[in-house]
A protein has these predicted regions:
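N-terminal subdomain of nucleotide-sugar transferases
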Residues: 1-49, 408-427
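Nucleotide-sugar donor phosphate/pyrophosphate-binding loop at the beta->alpha transition
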Residues: 116-118, 126-148
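Carbohydrate-associated surface elements
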Residues: 162, 184
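Glycosyltransferase donor-sugar binding loop
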Residues: 185, 238-257, 271
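Nucleotide-activated donor-binding/catalytic signature segment of Leloir-type glycosyltransferases, i.e.
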Residues: 252-276, 280
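Short alpha-helical donor nucleotide-sugar binding micro-motif in glycosyltransferases
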Residues: 284-289
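Short hydrophobic beta-strand element within catalytic cores of glycosyltransferases
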Residues: 291, 314-317, 327, 334-335
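Aromatic "clamp/platform" in nucleotide-sugar-dependent glycosyltransferases that forms part
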Residues: 297
Length: 427
């Protein structure tokens, strides 16, 4: 089988959970393929590479060719790259796309090559209204592209049961088209790794417990709510915020102001690491943490929680989206109740109470070191048992083959009409 994978993010240009997913899925598909399958990855960037049954082609930016600066140039750049990808695609038996950034290319390739289209849904645009702050009226385009892909896809992969429910609520596709295949984790790379010198390089005291956050500075990740919770956390701990890549200048400024306000309201050290930390160091930060906090207001799955759990660290997380399918309350961590403003506004309806609830859950685990240790061990066991990439890649290959066979059957059903002799209109 010739598999065409289309993605915005691909190593070394990865900034979010979707990129992590694609990276590991492609690695495992390549490893499993042998001589049976060939995988071609087309992505945004300058990546180029080839192997026996694998190659990658990056498509460079091109907004300057089509659009004046500032006039939806980011979205126009996306559309331009999609057109190029569709024009270069060839010899594929199935096309698999990730996120709205590649859905136009996927829809076009499906029509050009007459092959099944699979989309993996990592999030939904209507559930992320803050994207309008980031891309302006381009948000209308991203939402339209997502809706179009839902209508055109032969198969839809949801990364959690929560994500499947959201897809059905928002777009009402045929439920039979949706397959739930979880995200996974590399349990070799993400394992407990203790290196106190790395903590010291960030100004973290290795002898003092700390609470850890890792993520981008976005509305979705809920970091502002965690910052609001910091004054309510009991004294005697450190707070480590591994937070960079702000979506907008406005949220970057808000983050700076709120962190300074939190520092004035607590005796605990707040250590803010404002850049994206390399994986090797992130693993160390997870491993030494007393607990990890995921305050997201919208999280279809939450790979970040798997990363912490794989390193043997218990998790305090909002009970949103797919998180309860990963974090088992009372076993691998604590789930904090969450109520959104509405189905189209995922912010907490009572933000002050949410912040206090986060702090209460954090304080409860900080006060119980033996319980934290047991939860961390159970978290690692759960990750090993349920979230390995080999099983996820095999499920994906099986789904590809299922869709291919459906297409073959459909073509056979149509063949009698194709084979009928077309009458001549010559005299």
């Amino acid at each position: 089988m010739n598999i065409l994978m289309i993605t915005k993010e691909y190593p070394p240009h990865i900034y979010g959970g979707a990129g992590v997913h694609v990276d590991y899925l492609c690695r495992e598909l390549e490893r499993l393929s042998g001589a049976q399958h060939r995988l071609r990855v087309m992505c945004f960037g300058d990546q180029q590479g080839t192997g026996i049954n694998f190659d990658v082609t990056g498509i460079a930016g091109m907004s300057e060719l089509f659009c004046r600066k500032g006039a939806n140039d980011k979205v126009v750049d996306v559309l331009g790259r999609n057109i190029v990808i569709a024009g270069l695609a060839e010899m594929a038996d199935i096309v698999h796309c990730h996120t709205w950034y590649t859905f136009l290319a996927g829809c076009l390739v499906k029509q050009f090559l007459d092959i099944p289209l699979v989309i993996t849904v990592h999030s939904l645009e209507p559930k992320r209204p803050w994207k309008r702050e980031q891309i302006g009226t381009g948000y209308n385009v991203s939402s339209w592209l997502e809706k179009t892909a839902m209508e055109n896809a032969d198969g839809i992969i949801a990364v959690s049961q929560g994500m499947k429910k959201d897809i059905l609520d928002v777009y009402q596709p045929d439920p039979e088209k949706i397959r739930v295949i979880y995200n996974g984790i590399d349990t070799v790379q993400y394992t407990k790794t203790l290196k106190p010198d790395i903590l010291a390089s960030y100004g973290i005291d290795p002898l003092k417990p700390y609470v850890l956050f890792v993520g981008r500075i976005t509305r979705q990740k809920g970091i502002i709510h965690l910052v609001h919770a910091l004054p309510y956390i009991e004294s005697g701990v450190q707070i480590v915020l591994c937070a960079g890549a702000p979506d907008t200048e406005a949220i970057a400024h808000e983050m700076s102001v709120e962190v300074e306000r939190a520092r004035a309201g607590t005796s605990n050290d707040i250590i803010w690491i404002p850049e994206m930390v390399p994986v090797q160091r992130i693993v160390v930060l997870y491993s030494h943490a007393a607990l990890f906090v995921c305050p997201s207001v919208y999280e279809p799955f939450g790979i970040i929680n798997l990363e912490a759990m794989a390193c043997g660290t218990p998790v305090v997380a909002a009970a949103v989206g797919g998180i309860p399918e990963v974090v088992v309350h009372g076993k691998t961590g604590s789930l904090v109740p969450f109520a959104p403003v509405s189905s189209v506004d995922p912010e907490p309806c009572r933000p002050e109470q949410y912040a206090r609830n986060l702090a209460a859950a954090i304080n409860e685990l900080l006060a119980a070191p033996e319980k934290r240790q047991a939860m961390g061990a159970e978290a690692r066991r759960r990750v090993e048992a349920h979230f390995g990439w080999e099983a996820i890649a095999l499920q994906t290959l099986d789904y590809y083959e299922e869709l291919r066979q459906e297409r073959v059957h459909a073509l056979k059903e149509c063949r009698p009409y194709v084979d009928k002799k077309i009458p001549s209109f010559r005299a």
